[in-house]
Swiss-Prot record:
Catalytic activity: 5-O-(1-carboxyvinyl)-3-phosphoshikimate = chorismate + phosphate
Protein name per Swiss-Prot or TrEMBL: Chorismate synthase
Leading EC class: lyase
Cofactor binding: number and manner: Reduced FMN (FMNH(2)).
Gene Ontology CC entries for this record: cytosol
Native source organism of the sequence: Listeria innocua serovar 6a (strain ATCC BAA-680 / CLIP 11262)
Annotated spans, Disordered: 95-118
Sequence similarity: Belongs to the chorismate synthase family.
Any one Gene Ontology BP term: chorismate biosynthetic process
Residue sites binding NADP(+) per the record: R39, R45
Molecular function per GO: chorismate synthase activity; FMN binding
Keyword Membrane belongs to the record: no
Gene3D superfamilies: Chorismate synthase AroC
Length: 388
């Protein structure tokens, strides 16, 4: 299974096409729209979210509420397009049109300058329109489809915010996926710790007042995962590696870790490895989950636990120094409408990309042509691994 996305931040809209879904899987527009709505929430979002009320249009691949096995095409309209029709016109416009909003002062930390160099754009709007995090709208749409597939197979995905601006949630125990879903949805910053959430919101407000931005850490947990997804036989078949790549591919994300993550470097092996248990009711389990649900690049039946770190958004209302590409003189960087903190929304994007990679791994392991046979094969596999 694979997907492609297309579209610019202020263009007519965003498109994604998914290929490889099994036939007969239940899927409605509302399954996607509820995820799009979650992405638009969170304390610290900018004015754009008051304009865009994202709704998906499914234009191919589904009939009477079920997938056909053909490519599924989805489109999300940009409501703000009406204000950008000249700037983002498909047809040519006069080169010196006053509405062109040409960008010649690249923003530090963005794709602007290097993207302009790479593709020969002397107007870096050609770069920033595509590199914008607005593209994650349709990544969340694709992830919503993956989450629906996993849900039907008894696999659930939940994300939450662990840290913002140096304030970290004080979590004294592991949370079930259902608990994470319920508690994070009730929080303006998608945090499970109410005390930390209040401090996070204050830090976001302070950053906004100062024309600054802050980043943080999100965590995604996947429960009900069967053992044996991914493989150890080749480096590029390891599922944890694929998930790490997906996490770091999200705009502004700079790292990923599983389980205890980088803390493993500070602990002896006896405190890191997860002891193996067996019971007639549950089959093989682990006493702990320090490895985040992976051994040898494969799922081991424990929940997948992955975290991603997001840098502060590089668009600052108190802009940093840059250089004008025309005059080569020093100026303050260009300012585009942006958020002061997008970490809560990014947790929803992280859910989407993790769900996608797990769904792909499921379809790689089991028959993916028909959804009814897929469900049957997953259940048979669960029984086989339990009795091993």
């Amino acid at each position: 299974m694979r997907y492609l996305t297309a579209g610019e931040s202020h263009g007519p809209g965003l498109t994604t096409i998914i290929e490889g879904l099994p036939a007969g899987m239940p899927l409605l527009a509302e399954d996607v729209n509820k995820e799009l709505k979650r992405r638009q929430g969170g304390h610290g979002r900018g004015a754009r979210m008051r304009i865009e009320k994202d709704q998906v249009q499914i234009t191919a691949g589904i009939r009477h509420g079920k997938t056909l096995g053909a490519p599924v095409a989805m489109f999300v309209e940009n409501k703000d397009w009406k204000h950008w029709e000249t700037v983002m016109s498909i047809e040519p416009v006069p080169e010196k049109n006053e509405k062109s909003r040409r960008v010649s002062r690249p923003r530090p930390g963005h794709a602007d300058l290097v993207g302009g160099m790479k593709y020969g754009h002397n107007d870096m709007r050609n770069v920033l329109e595509r590199s914008s995090a607005r593209e994650t709208t349709v990544r969340v749409a694709a992830g919503a489809v993956a989450k629906k597939l996993l849900h039907e197979l008894g696999i659930e995905v939940a994300g939450h915010v662990l840290e913002i601006g140096g304030t970290r949630a004080n979590l004294k125990r592991d949370y079930a996926v259902s608990e994470i879903q319920e508690t994070s949805e009730a929080s303006p910053v998608r945090c499970l710790d109410e005390v930390a959430a209040e401090e996070m919101m204050q830090k976001i407000d302070d950053a906004k007042k100062n024309g600054d931005t802050i980043g943080g850490i999100v965590e995604v947990v996947v429960g009900g995962v069967p053992a044996g997804l991914g493989s150890y036989v080749q480096w590029d078949k390891k599922l944890d590696a694929k998930i790490a790549r997906a996490i770091v591919s999200i705009n502004a994300f700079k790292g990923a870790e599983f389980g205890v993550g980088f803390e493993a470097a500070r602990k002896p092996g006896s405190e890191v490895m997860d002891e193996i248990l067996w019971s007639k009711e549950d089959g093989y389990t682990r006493r702990t989950n320090n490895l985040g649900g992976f051994e040898g690049g494969m799922t081991n039946g424990m929940p997948i636990v992955v975290r991603g770190v997001m840098k502060p958004i590089p668009t600052l209302y108190k802009p940093l120094q840059s250089v004008d590409i025309d005059s080569k003189e020093t100026f303050n960087a260009s300012v585009e409408r942006s958020d002061s903190c997008a970490v809560p929304a990014a947790s929803v994007v992280a859910e989407a990309v993790v769900a996608w990679e797990v769904a792909v791994a499921v379809l790689e392991k089991f028959d993916g042509d028909r959804f009814d046979t897929l469900k049957k094969h997953v259940e048979e596999h669960r029984n086989l691994t339990k009795e091993f």
